């Protein structure tokens, strides 16, 4: 059962990575949801498998580090649960009725196919903009967000709505269809590859290193929710939207307040027929309980509010020619067939390939190479081959045969265990396909984030035998790089990219321990678990010396990840990788500043309101450097809440849960002496 859980969790994490980091998903929304539901059902049956690091407990983008500075949301920024049919929508409404009766009215909003963004206004001035990230911590994209036409630097004065001291507002960044088409046309004229769809282009444009590039791309934004507020407590969401509009923030003109489920369904049906009349892409309708007090009663899971749901429309379809089926070997050895097709427009973007998952799925769909096939964009995002148009066959089609040996190394393929639909290459150490994927993983943003070591560069280094595996990366020299055409000029000198690669590799040697742990490709160890292990043990050697039980006892790790870590370090060539990196100068231990006493080890502190003696960042830094956790929301696990001037809803939550509340003097004593600290009302 543990192995089944591990496989499911690994698949979910892989698809989350492809969606949130690469912007290149390979399965449909429905297929992903089915994987997640299977994982949830397994954890319900065997609760001991559920760990804080499980995909079922995290918001979709959790654990994928980026090149932008991390910033903590004032209040959690959650995802939405989905409904794909009337039955699922009715079941959700039934749960609402069971909890709060017939009193709930609903807001129906268009589900914009874009990128979530959180804005923070303090005293009416924009102070921060961040992406969703893992729901607690996102990327700071303030400079880029300021270039968006719809995002005001300062809120407008309103006679009817008092401006709040602090306003955290959530919304969606997107492209209008016409602007997206113009952007792609300009990219083609410049000889660059066009974006696949508006969502990908919005994500890429918002995360540009140069804000001037973002400014040229005509991004738009619509606000659709609130986070933390101080001095603003609307009774209903539609009243909140009126206030946002009065302050100059963009809100949708297509939002409708309705009384019951029948009216909800009517709005869903209407927009299903008129979706292309909107100037931006939509992939559904979001339904929310309007009453804020009822929202609080309904609460949320670890990843989504119970008072809202996204109804997803059936995807659009098109026909095209299936030119070939080829297989790809992934980082873990999984062999996946892919359909290569004549490029065709579906739901506003061009599709040329799609995953077929495994041989059983190819057989189930009944597709042959040479078929005319029906494809769709599930959730209007992910391409999927539905099946063949049998009537158009002319006899030239041929059956796809899954290889019995690895196309990369020739090793016989086999399922990991009897009954598995997936087959794998067991040659984990030296299979060229797996090697390329592992080298690429070392350089990825959620690992060591090494620029100039992309997929092409890694493949070139391996094919030229400059490196044998990822263990050789940090010992690379200028002479060795000159053996590859990719890093050699026509004059025979090292190229600028080659020099940058060597500099970036040298810089990566000083990366924090958690990034090194992620880069080692230990199964199940993402940034969340890696950070927990690095914080607890401080060095690779201490982690290796720890027992499985000691590893499992770390918050955020648990037995599954602990077993994977222990097993990984028992393999000889795994340990060789570590030692080669160590010998090349990669730091295998975090440096701790012993001059600052760790008075807050194991203590979780939430700060609300303004403190005269600390900025928000200074207060957080003071907590973290003393070994504590600076959290963004109050829960039963919160040790203390520090309340300054004009505290917000976090103060109320602390009172409700009985969490000790400190003023600034109490906070200073806590920093100096550690707990127990004397609680006191804010001054």
From Swiss-Prot:
EC number(s) per entry: 6.5.1.2
SUPFAM superfamilies: BRCT domain (SSF52113), DNA ligase/mRNA capping enzyme, catalytic domain (SSF56091), Nucleic acid-binding proteins (SSF50249), RuvA domain 2-like (SSF47781)
Active-site residues from the entry: 111
Swiss-Prot/TrEMBL catalytic activity: NAD(+) + (deoxyribonucleotide)n-3'-hydroxyl + 5'-phospho-(deoxyribonucleotide)m = (deoxyribonucleotide)n+m + AMP + beta-nicotinamide D-nucleotide
Superkingdom of origin: Bacteria
Molecular function terms from GO: DNA ligase (NAD+) activity; metal ion binding
UniProt enzyme class: ligase
Listed Pfam families: BRCT, DNA_ligase_aden, DNA_ligase_OB, DNA_ligase_ZBD, HHH_2, Nlig-Ia
Binding site for NAD(+): 29-33, 79-80, 109, 132, 172, 288, 312
Residues in BRCT domain copies: 595-683
Family from the record: Belongs to the NAD-dependent DNA ligase family. LigA subfamily.
PANTHER family assigned to the protein according to its UniProt record, in alphabetical order: CHROMOSOME TRANSMISSION FIDELITY FACTOR 18, DNA LIGASE
Name of the protein in question: DNA ligase
